[in-house]
Amino acid sequence: MADDLYQKGIKKIQELTASADDNPTGFMDIGEAFKDIAPDLTQYVVEFAFAGIYSRPGRDNKQKVLTTITALVAQGKPQIGMHIKTGLTVGLTPEEIIGCIMHLIPYTGFPSVLGALTVAKEVFNEQGITVDTSAFQ
């Protein structure tokens, strides 16, 4: 049963990242970084977050990833870059991602939004993506 749950989580990660790789977009680096003190972290991330939460019905992957990006902006968490990459993979446009981040200014404040925009800009630059700023005028 646990192996089935783990495999379900791995399949969901691969679906979200369009990768057959064993470490798509660095998701597994999280567990690897802490295996000396929390050797079961990867299992929790894969089984709970991806086999459980991300696999729940009712919302498509774009909505789920945009919700995750929103939560990470609000918390000012560094994992936002990984999830921006995932958002692009599941079909979010750069403009949708930037629009979401900008919408959070009155709710999370300028510092968290500026931090998120910095990360988004880095991700877009790495991937050679240009944002259509006319969408915001």
Regions found by a protein language model. Name each.
Residues P78-E96, V113-V123:
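Extended intrinsically disordered, low-complexity coil regions enriched in Ser, Thr, Gly, Ala
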Residues V73-A74, V90, H103-F110:
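A short structural micro-motif
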Residues M1-N61, G115-Q137:
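Acidic, glycine/proline-rich low-complexity segments that act as flexible tails and inter-domain linkers
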Residues L41, Q63, G76-H83:
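Amphipathic alpha-helical interface surfaces
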Residues Q63-L72, C100-I101:
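Short, structured motif recognition centered on aromatic/hydrophobic residues
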Residues G58, A74-P78, G109-V113:
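Short helix-coil transition sites and intra-membrane helix breaks within transmembrane domains
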Residues H83, C100-H103:
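Short, hydrophobic/aromatic alpha-helical segments in well-folded domains
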